[in-house]
Amino acid sequence: MVLMLLAICAVLILFICLPAEIWSGGGEAAAEEAAVEVPMTEEDEEQADLAATTLVKEGMMAPDFTVTLFDGSQVTLSSLRGRVVLLNFWATWCPPCREELTRVQAELIDRFADRPFTFLPVSRGEERETVAAFREKTGYTFAMGLDPEQAIYKLYAANYIPRNFLIDREGRVVLASIGYEPEEFDALVARIDALLGE
């Protein structure tokens, strides 16, 4: 009996002596003080930075624009509704952009020529003369959009190229990617094929 009374007294003393902040809901603050922030790795920081520069995310409607093509004609993105569109931002000085473009003719334009697909590459921040010299050197003949003031690019992103925005038939972005990796390009081609099959 004495032991039981001592145990009850000890429990009562414990409750009386607990800090008031725990009773008043301050337990979260106490828990936060006990938590340790895990520093981000350099790779985590780089990925967060890349993601933050993407203004149009997957699931969003693609912002509409009108772009002047290399041949002087114009195309408005919304006029392509009903087609799957791959919007690609690139520049002639960008090595991964140039590497990605080497795969476009055979793996996109020729492959999907008889299907409702449009490849819309937009040169970011370059004048027509620069793109003309690049086309002459490479022999590319597919349509290329010009965005010398980066007005179109700034609707979609704040930094980094190459960038791809895969847009479905309703005008919704279903994939947004940064950079060029051969395996990711393969996956992109497969995704286009799947969208065209829907």
Predicted features and spans:
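Active-site acidic short loop of glycosyltransferases
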Residues: 80-83, 114, 140-141, 158-159
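Thiol/disulfide oxidoreductase modules built on the thioredoxin-like
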Residues: 133-141, 147-195
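Structural microenvironment flanking redox-active thiols in thiol-disulfide oxidoreductases
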Residues: 98-138, 148-155, 190
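Conserved hydrophobic/aromatic "anchor" residues
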Residues: 65, 80, 89-93, 134, ...
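Conserved redox-active cysteine motifs that mediate thiol-disulfide chemistry
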Residues: 81-82, 89-106
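A short beta-strand-turn-helix
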Residues: 56-59, 64-85
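Hydrophobic beta-strand core positions in alpha/beta domains
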Residues: 86-88, 121, 166
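N-terminal targeting signals for export/organelle localization
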Residues: 1-61, 189, 198
